[in-house]
Amino acid sequence: RFLFNYHMDRIFREQPLDGRVLGIEAHYTPTILPGQTKPLVSWKTDGNIDFHEPSVTVKARKGIVIATGGNTGNVEFRRMFDPRLTSEFQLGGGEWSPQDGSGELAAMAIGAALWGCCNQAMNRNGALRRGAFVGSRTSYVAWKPQSPIWGKVKATGLFVGNWQDCIAVNQAGKRFYDETKPAYPNGTCFGFFDKSGGYVHGDWRNSSKIKPQFRNYIDAACAINEGSQGPDWEAGPQWAIFDSAAIKREQWKIDENSGEEGYFFKADTLDELQEKLTQNPYQKFKMPKGRLAETVARYNAFVEKGVDEDFDKPKPRYKIEQGPFYAAWCTVCTHDTYAGLRVNGKNQVVDMAGKVIPGLYCGGESAGGATQHGMGRCFTAGYIIGAEVVKG
């Protein structure tokens, strides 16, 4: 049976930091879309528990399984691993999967340890993604107005097929990297499955065999810049800047669903566009007057020369000169969780002394120590936990 629309807040244990887990406490958190009065309901109703009290406690008969989806939506939590990830970096999919770290925090309160913390910032770097869409906070996934959660998503965004059509600027109104470069180099880009690439699994000489590929877009996007201010020194948002000619080349159809209010702007001049950016809650830095126009003029000069003297964008092709002009949110988003609760081979949660917390299990992105995400990770943990938890 399933109890939906409740948020787990607390785990009970026989002693504050000792003994078996006993149950949980949760509070009622229905999802009500803007303009509606009734909460969203699951498409599956068979076996669901009809319960709407403000809070509930549930006794655990066999055990407790934490599978709360990770912590990259919790700004203070994720900054323990990567201080750069201040609030402007939105969670990809956060509208429907908040990844608030609640499972980790509840387990830590009864003594659980964290694990694999370096993975969050230093491994595949899947925790940070450069979204394919601009103009909406959910830059990682596109949604249509027909979606049942459209009231939370609010915009489809625009898919950028060719970054020769746009430039990306930081909160100070300056370019910061070659816009055509992808994010972090991982997977097949180094010839992992290409014999001609020279890669041999487990061979420490790979780094000398393979020509390095410089793909530091995300590091550049997260770097302290002219607009960063204490105490947190936020990198601030990034904006895709383009003109009407780019819209035709990209074959975009701009309508009321394309961009989210406060994250997509249009103006007749670049100075007017720059002023509108201050309407975004994360654009805290006020650019010097004329900054955006100066940046575009410099880039247009590179187009005339055919050489990007600042960031080596290959043969910049198109000037940004035909109004109206546009600015679309293209800020790097957070995504996968690789740091989480410490578990053993049976997916039992382990405390700071390396001892198992009896009856407590964790799987999926709330469990730490993994360097790979995806359904395989979830299925494997679910299989193991299912076999173990029934033993009581």
For each feature predicted by the language model, list its residue ranges:
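A conserved beta-strand/loop element that lines the FAD pocket in flavoprotein oxidoreductases
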Residues: 1-9, 58-59, 117
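A conserved short coil-to-beta-strand element within the FAD-binding core of flavoproteins
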Residues: 4-22, 27-31
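Short, well-ordered coil/turn residues at beta-beta hairpins
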Residues: 27, 60-61, 66-68, 171, ...
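Glycine-rich loop(s) and the adjacent beta-strand/alpha-helix scaffold that form part
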Residues: 32-134
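An anion/pyrophosphate-binding glycine-rich loop and adjacent beta-alpha core
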Residues: 104, 110-284
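Internal hydrophobic alpha-helix adjacent to the cofactor/substrate pocket in enzyme cavities
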Residues: 106-113, 379-392
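Glycine-rich phosphate/pyrophosphate-binding beta-alpha loops
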Residues: 122-127, 181-187, 333-338, 365-376
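A glycine-rich dinucleotide-binding beta-alpha-beta segment and adjacent secondary-structure elements
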Residues: 285-370
